[in-house]
Amino acid sequence: GTFAFDKGKNDYGMVVLSNESKEKGVVCADAVRFGGGMGNIARGGETSGLPRYLEGSRYFAQWAGMPYPVYSGREGKDDMSDDINSRSKMINYLSGGSIFNPEEQGLGVPFEMAMALHSDAGTSKEDKIVGTLGIYTTKFNKGLLAGGTNRYASRDLSDIILTQLQRDIHSNYAIDWTRRSLWDRNYSETRLPAVPSTIIELLSHQNFADMRLGHDPNFKFTVGRSIYKAILQYLCNQHGKDYVVQPLPVSNFSIRFGDKKNTLELSWK
């Protein structure tokens, strides 16, 4: 990619290495990479020529060092199916051996949930917002997850995320954002994970009303923060804990002389 920095030396146009640590030693960098790099997994004798973030999960899983069965369950004969399934298999391998996935061999990372963020297809003839759909799976493995939790925990996760998204988008943009539905369906990304999981179909990439916001960086920030708040709420509810949402820094800060002598008035949003 292309990474533009402001001209000259400033606080934003630099890479900083710090050796601030309790341990003695020297920190050095032989190279610095911005972004995820270019795809380097060859299929059919050549690489894609695309940045890695535009490639599928199957190729990332191989590059990340996942075991062969994780990224190539179809033995290299069906990359599309491997791409879909590798997402869940990575979660299971990473969490294997943890309290949330005790029977499966893996790296023991205690992942508590998984969320796949998608965009969906579909259009509205009335140019209305298609909106957000949540998907989960309960009819698998006798209704239980690997740690013994009821699979309806995935429904709770889906519901909390959809509710928070609808609330935050409406609050920030005064838009009646559509909450489409909650589907209990047989999808790989919600069936295979050993932990509670959901697919969030955020918006329709085919529908103009949705895409008016889809590429707005402010909208993306709102969505990202909304999902963070929803996951925080879900996890704390699971553990019976109170939670505090990380506050945002103030914006539109200004200072003006106050109405009384020798006073200043500070304001912000």
Where are each of the predicted segments found?
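Active-site-adjacent substrate-binding region
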Residues: 152-183
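Short beta-strand-plus-loop segments that form exposed binding edges in beta-rich domains
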Residues: 3, 13-25
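Stable alpha-helical elements in mature extracytoplasmic
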Residues: 25-28, 49, 53, 57, ...
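Extracellular carbohydrate recognition and processing domains
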Residues: 1-8
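Pro/Thr/Ser/Gly-rich low-complexity, intrinsically disordered linker/stalk tracts
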Residues: 233-267
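Active-site-adjacent mobile loop/cap segments within catalytic or ligand-binding domains
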Residues: 11, 20, 31-39, 98, ...
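Active-site microenvironments of hydrolase-like enzyme catalytic domains
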Residues: 54-155, 159, 183-206
